[in-house]
Amino acid sequence: MQPILILIMVWSHSIFAEEVDDLYISLVPIPDQTLASRHQGINDALKNVLVKLTGNSAVVQLAAVQSSLKNATLYVDAISFEALPNNLSIYDNAEGLNLGLRVNFSHSAIDNLIRRSELPVLPSNRPKLIFWIVRDDVEAGRRLLGKDTKGASFTDADEQLMRDLSRVMKDRGIPFILPSLDLEDQLTLSAEEAWNLASEKIEIASERYGADAWVAMRFYRSSNGKIRGSWKYWANNKSYFDDFGMESDVSFIPPVINELIDGLAGSFSYVPQKTKNVLIVKVFDVQSLDNYKKINEELTRLELVNS
């Protein structure tokens, strides 16, 4: 029965995980269509793709990656110009550019770069996260922010926060959801409990959403205008906590979430080997051609399997 146990271990790594597409594609802002702008755009796009594939933003600082960035065009399959979407984060497009460069990279070339540089890989079958975000406001008090949050206390800064969160998670290729904050959520988890980062309460409130991991984040604006906060996440039966402080609430989400994802993704990633290993898996009671096809499809979906 050992072969069956091996398969169970692989599939149970992330029960509710979702398949993520476009991991080898990046859209970046550029000032114009000149050759210099295209080269810089391709360089930026390669950084984005490597961060998205590895789950770690620090990889672009490695010497092996830096040398590859100098020849980023070697990894390109196709490029195209297009207008940037309105929801592009101010953090990603600080100069307010309107033109974007979409870069499609070669799967095999990028995979070889990752293997050669011994970088981690976050599989395309990725964990789905749920975010519990609570803001402490002088006038409105402590208040959870969800996907349907509206009302007078929902500020422009809150709206920007939601856009930034959505953009960062898309850039990182991580599926996520926000709670609906309906009556069931309100009865299960109060804003005060979320503010206290009460793990047991947050875990119970997250169960109905079928997420692989949860993230709780609290923040407030101090008297000097700076943003202060903390976050905690739970993944693979382990929890992690950290504090953060930023100058402004307009763009604090991208750096905070990127740091958080760097740590969380490590629980779901692996480092591919330079040499190929062979594992013989025996599957019993395959009684039809249809069953055989389904088994093949499931095996070939695994990042670790080549053939």
Language model region names:
Residues 21, 40-56, 105, 112-121, ...:
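C-terminal/domain-edge helix-coil "capping" segments
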Residues 1-7:
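Sec-dependent signal peptide recognition
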Residues 12-14:
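N-terminal signal peptide c-region/cleavage motif recognized by signal peptidases
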Residues 42-68, 127, 131-195, 295-307:
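N-terminal segment of the mature soluble domain
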Residues 62-135, 140-144, 160:
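Signal peptide-directed extracytoplasmic domains
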Residues 20-29, 102, 106-109, 206-253:
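Amphipathic beta-strand/beta-sheet edge segments enriched in Tyr/Trp
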Residues 74-87, 177-180, 193-226:
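A short, hydrophobic beta-strand-centered structural micro-motif
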Residues 20-25, 74-76, 96-100, 124-130, ...:
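Extracytoplasmic
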